[in-house]
C-alpha cells in the first residue's frame, strides 16, 4: 500500500467536536466521492496507528480535505489530530470505500456518518446534478449538525434534520422510525444510501425492508 507524507495546510473548528483538515495533495492522487483512506500522524510513535477517514472535498481541489469528529475521551487518533497545527505531517494511503453514487435517492446519515455524503453532494452540485436527491440527517442536538448551511443551500427542503435529544420546534424530535420515513420519504421505489453507527444502520435496514425497499437498492457503510 502506497504511503504519502503530507503537510497540514489548515485546520478549522466546524462544531464543538468536529474539525476540518486540509492537507497537501500528492501528485496524481484521486478518489471517487464517498471514498476514504487510512490516515495516521507522521511521528515515530503514531505513524502506524491508522484510522479510516472519508474525503470531503473534490478531486478538483488543490488539497485533500477531511472533516473529522474528535473523540478526546477515546485517547486515540482523533485526540492526536485535534492537537495538530498547519505544518504538521500526516500519512495518507490508498483510497477505498463502499459508498459511491449510484443514482438519485435518499441519503440517511447519523452523526459523523455524514462525511461520505459531503463529497458526493459537493460533486453533484458541481455538475448541476443534485436535484432529485434527499438527505435525512440524525443528530443528538442542533449544535451537532455538520455543515447545515451548506446542505440547506444545496438541497433546500430536501435537507431534513431529526434530533434525538434536543427538542426544538423547527426539527422533528426522536429516533428515525418507520412512521417518520413513511411521512418524510413517501416514494420508496428509489435508491437509499445509509451511513452511521451500526445500531442505527441495522434498525434502518429493517425499517426500509418493511417499507418495501430491497437490498439491491441499499448502499450501506458503517
What are these regions (language model features)?
Residues 1-2, 92:
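N-terminal helix initiation/capping motif
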Residues 73-222:
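FNR/FR-type flavoprotein reductase catalytic core
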Residues 2-86, 139-141, 165-166:
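Ferredoxin-reductase
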